[in-house]
Amino acid sequence: MSNAYEEYMRQMVIPMRQELVRSGFEELTTEEAVTEFMENTTGTTLVVVNSVCGCAAGLARPSAGQAVVRAEKQPDHLVTVFAGQDKDATAKMREYFGEIPPSSPSMALLKGKEVVHFIHRHEIEGATMDEIITNLEQAFEKNC
């Protein structure tokens, strides 16, 4: 049974989830969904580790959405997990990131199950939206 705080948080993050879904991202909300996706997907995947923090709202989510609209080459798949909300799904996805330390928000470009490009929170916080979009576009150009 959930408490009032958990219910409040579930309601509060709905727009934060929808922002990426509207941009074409599939939400993976359970450990099983992550495993199913990762074990049965080929090609390239952009994974956004979503977060409630300000840099996710002002930089990460809008940059990811714009990058997939603007880029000539794009990943085959777009998925997102929500750190702090869908804890099991996020932990499972991070297992596929290998030795890369947990970071949220963050973005990972995978070829199959291999991380070929990663943007950490500290790289998001210190950048402009255009810099993040360019970073992603260059990664897409090289890997997709």
Swiss-Prot record:
One of its GO terms (biological process) is cell redox homeostasis. It holds the Pfam family Disulph_isomer. Transmembrane segments: none annotated. InterPro entries: BrxB/BrxA. Belongs to the bacilliredoxin family. PANTHER family: BACILLIREDOXIN BRXA, UPF0403 PROTEIN YQIW-RELATED. This is Bacilliredoxin BA_2173/GBAA_2173/BAS2019. It comes from Bacillus anthracis.
